[in-house]
Design a protein with these regions (language model features):
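Short coil/turn linking the two alpha-helices of tandem helical-hairpin repeats
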Residues: 1, 62-74, 101-112, 139-149, ...
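Short coil/linker segments at helix-helix boundaries
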Residues: 2-37, 72-75, 114, 143-153, ...
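Hydrophobic/aromatic packing residues within the alpha-helices of TPR/SEL1-like helical repeat arrays
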Residues: 46, 84-85, 123, 159, ...
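Short helix-capping/linker turns of helical repeat alpha-solenoids
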Residues: 51-58, 67-69, 90-97, 104-109, ...
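TPR/Sel1-like alpha-solenoid repeat signature
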Residues: 58-61, 97-104, 122, 135-141, ...
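Catalytic cores of eukaryotic secretory-pathway lumenal/extracellular enzymes that build
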Residues: 93-95, 102, 112-116, 120-141, ...
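Terminal, low-structured helical/coil segments at or just beyond the last alpha-helical repeat
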Residues: 234, 627-681
């Protein structure tokens, strides 16, 4: 039996055997029966409480039926809709109304027909009751014209309400604000982009250096973060200070890759690791002790050395900045502003920017003995901002913003955005642009531009501040479970988030539903015919993602119209023309070599646009200029194009299909005469 229990962990053993071992020999079947019994009991108790008029039990039932937490609770979206309807009618609860709006907006599982008017009604009530998700959904609907006429100012009002909630939550945290959630990853990015590495805009050019693409490359190479951490630990234990510092950063931010902009900017969600403040402090303290062997009995008695040009502290100064921040915020240690100030002063001796920023917060807010000194605070913030520290630039911008010096404030906020600020700077810039848009004296064209900027920035703030109801993170966990039930739950959560305007959720949902991945689609080996309903849903999500500046999604839209996926009822001519327009829109960004190649092929074959070999060659050339990885397909296409043109010219053609001309000695053009061969484009 011991041997059998060990065999169940071997990958070469058939799954039906390991399942048997797990259930029969490991006691799994008995445990399953116990858990199933507990789930039935929970549902029975909640049903009984709901029948007795307990509205919280009614809402809990609706959540269990719509978002079952595990396999013991079966999904029952139809029951969930009925329970949400009852709960909303009895209590007017905003959360129930928001989910009812989702059902009517999407027609999920055909429980109710799609009715955008009813969706609008439920979401409006929920939004006015303060439900942030409903406010975001309303803002997105007015911004995109879903069920309503596009109205930027109305969209701005809804997104402002959501962003204000998020900012209030952010400011309720420790000094410096709450820790930002990690940036969620797109499923397609983890595979090198929608079209794979090399062909997708998401993984070519400057985008190839994005943390999520580095993570995708690491996964493709079979690397695991546990192996990386073990390697770093091995080198750190040998006294390699740079590896110890990297480990401290990784465990502090809970991610292998941090965002630009400083400590406060968060990290990448694709390279997530378990966050461990105690381990981070261990490594930072080990580094710092190489310069500061001991601490004074009273940190308030610490005095900065008078030496004007102290020797370089290297990583110790950087570690001091992190240690000061941890004491300032109570992360892994007891919150102690005096200790924080001591560590910040140590780092500031060596000009470390995080330490300058931390001292600015302490003096501005009077966190040590209530002593405030705005002049000192501004001096420290300026020193950090001069080193492109995003958070310090935000603090300087806020200082001018509070004094109504909006022009100077904008300068600092814009500098913070360039330095990598992912949150606060956008909030205040949105407020400034909103005031411009609402000013009656502002010209209409400027007001419209300011409104669009304000909506975009408020939307970004509302979507980043997900400390509660983080649908993207919950969906990621469900998807990574690997079970069919988990994947179905993940898609539901992405769908809810997509209706609230999250481009990541729209991309994920479209990518999962995408039926145009197989290169065999148009051969006799093609898989079964795609579902037009599923393709239509994917097309909708691709369109919404493309409208939020996802270039690969824009190319996908062209593919769907070209292949007739989700638009089978439209005539081919119309579909090809629309496909060409989408490819052209993507090509105009000068980032998608694939879109340019597609356009070249359509010009070459006269599909969706007039046949023109000159424009075909031009787009093939542009594809290669945009992405050198397109060398092989572009060269093959050019060879074929010139062969076609040569045959056309031999037959006497002289129109836009003739790429071949000869220049005679007089400089005139003639065909097939001695002279210098020139390819014309």
């Amino acid at each position: 039996m011991r041997i059998a229990l060990k065999l169940r962990h071997q990958t070469w053993v058939p799954s039906f055997v390991t399942n048997f071992f797990g259930k029969e020999l490991g006691g799994g079947r008995k445990k399953e029966e116990e858990l199933h019994g507990k789930a039935v009991k929970v549902l029975d108790l909640l049903h009984h409480a709901a029948e007795l008029g307990h509205t919280d039990a009614l809402y809990a039932l609706s959540q269990l039926h719509l978002f079952p937490p595990n396999q013991w609770f079966p999904p029952e979206p139809g029951l969930s809709y009925e329970e949400l309807s009852s709960h909303a009618s009895i209590t007017g609860n905003a959360s129930s109304q928001a989910l009812l709006g989702f059902f009517h907006a999407t027609g999920y599982k055909d429980i109710v027909p799609i009715d955008q008017a009813k969706a609008q009604l439920y979401l409006t009530f929920a939004g006015h009751s303060g439900h942030k998700g409903a406010q975001m959904a309303m803002g997105y609907r007015y911004w995109s014209g879903i069920g309503v006429v596009e109205d930027c100012m109305t969209a701005l009002s809804w997104y402002e309400d959501a962003a204000e909630q998020v900012m209030a939550k952010f400011m309720s945290g420790p000094p410096g604000g709450r820790t930002l959630p990690l940036v969620p990853a797109k499923l397609s990015d983890l595979e090198g982009g929608v079209f794979g590495p090399g062909a997708s805009v998401a993984s070519t050019g400057l985008n190839a250096a994005r943390p999520v693409i580095k993570t995708a490359n690491a996964r493709a190479a079979g690397e695991k973060w546990d192996d990386l951490l073990e390697y770093y630990s091995y080198n750190a234990d040998r006294g390699e200070v740079d590896f110890a510092y990297r480990l401290g950063k990784i465990f502090y931010q809970g991610s292998i890759y941090g965002s630009t902009g400083g400590i406060a900017s968060g990290g990448d969600g694709a390279s997530r690791v378990v966050r461990d403040f105690h381990t981070a402090r261990h490594y930072f303290l080990r580094i710092a002790r190489q310069v500061w062997q001991r601490d004074p009995p009273n940190p308030r008695q610490y005095q900065t050395p008078k030496e004007k040009n102290p020797p370089s502290a290297g990583y110790a100064a950087l570690a001091a900045g992190y240690l000061g921040r941890m004491f300032l915020r109570g992360e892994g240690v007891k919150q102690d502003a005096a200790m924080a100030k001591m560590w910040f002063e140590r780092g500031a001796e060596y000009g470390e920017k995080e330490s300058h920023n931390g001292l600015g917060i302490i003096w501005r807010d009077g966190l040590v003995d209530g002593k405030k000194d705005l002049k000192k605070a501004l001096t420290y913030f300026t020193a950090a901002a001069a080193q492109d520290h995003a958070e310090a630039q935000v603090h300087l911008g806020k200082h001018h913003f509070m004094r109504n010096e909006l022009k100077q404030a904008s300068v600092y906020f814009e500098a913070a955005v360039r330095s990598g600020s992912p949150f606060e700077a956008y909030y205040y810039l949105a407020d400034i642009q909103s005031s411009i848009a609402r000013n009656p004296a502002t010209p209409a064209e400027i007001a419209g531009s300011s409104c669009a900027i304000a909506v975009s920035f408020n939307k970004l703030v509302a979507e980043r501040g997900l400390w509660n109801d983080n649908l993207l993170e919950e969906a990621e966990i469900a998807w990574n479970s690997g079970t069919d039930r988990g994947k179905e739950l993940a898609m539901l959560k992405w769908w809810v988030a997509a209706e609230r305007g999250f481009e990541t959720a729209q991309n994920n949902l479209a990518f999962v539903l995408d039926q145009d991945k197989s290169i065999l689609r148009f051969t006799r080996f093609a898989p079964q015919s795609p579902s037009n309903d599923t393709a239509r849903l994917a097309l909708t999500q691709w369109a919404r993602s493309a409208a939020q500046r996802n270039i690969d999604a824009l190319v996908k839209l062209g593919d769907y119209y070209y292949h007739g996926l989700g638009v089978a009822d439209e005539p081919k001519t119309t579909r090809y023309e629309k496909a060409a327009r989408y490819y052209q829109s993507a090509a105009d960004t000068h980032m998608s070599a694939l879109a340019m190649w597609n356009l070249g092929w359509m010009y070459e074959n006269g599909i969706g646009m007039p046949r023109d070999f000159h424009l075909a060659k031009r787009h093939y050339d542009l594809a290669l200029e945009t992405n050198t990885e397109a060398y092989v397909p572009v060269m093959l296409s050019l060879i074929k194009l010139h062969a076609k043109s040569l045959w056309h010219t031999i037959l006497g053609g002289e129109d836009n299909l003739n790429l071949w001309t000869f220049e005679d000695a007089e400089g005139g053009a003639s065909h097939f005469l001695p002279g210098t061969l020139r390819l014309r484009c």
